[in-house]
Amino acid sequence: MDPVQLLSFLLALLLPLGTALDASKQKRDTAFEIYKKLFEVKRKDQINALNNLIELNDVNQQYKIIDIMLKGLFKVLEDSRAILIAAGVQPDGPFPEDEKIKDAYSHTVENSAFFGDVVLRFPKIVHHYFDRNSNWNNLIRWGIGFCNLSGIFDDGPHTQLLGLMSQELGISEKSPDYKNPFKMDNMEFLPNTDAFQKALREEEKRRRKEEKRKEIRKGPRITRSRSEL
């Protein structure tokens, strides 16, 4: 899968899977259980996409893709939080029936989990963006709290995800036995790889050029005086 196709696939994963439920005919607890099964399907797609990203074996491409992906992810998370708060949805309450609220619920749970996958597999790249963005920090803290109370992560293969990502991000204190389970699987973890440092320098250079171009475009314009008109 080439980088463009992979990026399109990753961005598509930021959208909810959908529940295909007739809520009026299902008990709310049944709707929640059905969603949990659909959540597992979405999680498999997310993991497969990240495995493809790892297999690119190109730090520059990974850097650019993750940059775009994280901006989209946190925009979705921010919009979803606004919807859920406005609707007064409690994460440990009944599973929502309204389609818009249901989508916001799915967005929150799925994208919070997906961000955990990304930070555990690409910690250095994610930290480079995340650590300087207080808005993202606040959003993911809220997302983790929502997920912890939702009950979706209480059992199954994702029970440790929220705790691991919280420790990796510095949201919670690292336990003495903390270990990133993916640390040996990805060369991105090497502390001073030439490839990563080169990608970092190139990205910073690109950002400075882009900021300079924006400043030039926003610069003062020459206007004619009334006497010249």
From Swiss-Prot:
Biological processes annotated in GO: positive regulation of MyD88-dependent toll-like receptor signaling pathway; positive regulation of Wnt signaling pathway; regulation of protein glycosylation
Family annotation (Pfam families): ERK-JNK_inhib (PF15002)
Signal peptide bounds: 1-22
Keywords assigned: Coiled coil, Endoplasmic reticulum, Signal
Location of region: Disordered: 201-229
Subcellular location field: Endoplasmic reticulum lumen
Family statement drawn from the similarity comment of this UniProt entry: Belongs to the CCDC134 family.
Protein name: Coiled-coil domain-containing protein 134
Organism, as annotated: Xenopus tropicalis
